[in-house]
Regions:
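An aromatic-glycine-centered, glycine-rich loop/turn in mixed alpha/beta architecture
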Residues: 75-153
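Carbohydrate-recognition loop of C-type lectin domains
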Residues: 1-99
């Protein structure tokens, strides 16, 4: 039994190890051994402290570069920011621990009002991406998008 706990930060600082252990202990099946790369003690109903294991995922930063053609007739003030925000919202909803970043899936949220066409889309795990291949995320990692890593021109 392994819990992979992502707290929304790159260093795991939002939720303490003790709080993670308490959460795992609360929902852990009885008699099933827990495993993981991190651990902490938490009190049980028996009054004893129990060592609980869990894993924090490796954060994989995702960089994306969109080249677009705008449609000024739509009257949208800043469709480039709207596109970036739509991709971020999509990523927050879609990408969990172990979920691959599928290159073609990023076209869907990118078509916001004011965008006529997407002429190029590149993704990668380093600045200035040039790839169109999917980003494979293993079971102990999570793809994380950030507005500072999405470029729209």
């Amino acid at each position: 039994f392994e819990c992979v706990i992502y707290d929304g930060t790159t260093d795991g600082s939002a939720i303490s190890d003790a709080d993670c252990a308490a959460l795992v202990w609360k929902c852990k099946p009885s008699g099933i051994r827990d495993v993981g790369t991190s651990s902490a003690y938490t009190p049980g109903a028996d009054g004893l402290n129990h060592l609980v294991h869990f894993t924090r995922p490796t954060v994989v930063p995702v960089y994306a570069t969109f080249a677009v053609v705008q449609n000024s007739a739509d009257g949208v003030v800043n469709p480039l920011i709207d596109l970036r925000d739509a991709v971020l919202a999509f990523a927050r909803d879609k990408y969990n621990v172990g979920t691959d970043v599928v290159w073609s899936s990023l076209f869907r949220p990118a078509f916001v009002r004011g965008i006529y066409d997407i002429t190029d889309l590149f993704i990668g795990t380093a600045p200035s991406p040039s790839g169109t291949a999917n980003i494979i995320i293993d079971d102990h990692s999570i793809a994380v998008f950030d507005s500072s890593r999405i470029t729209v021109t």
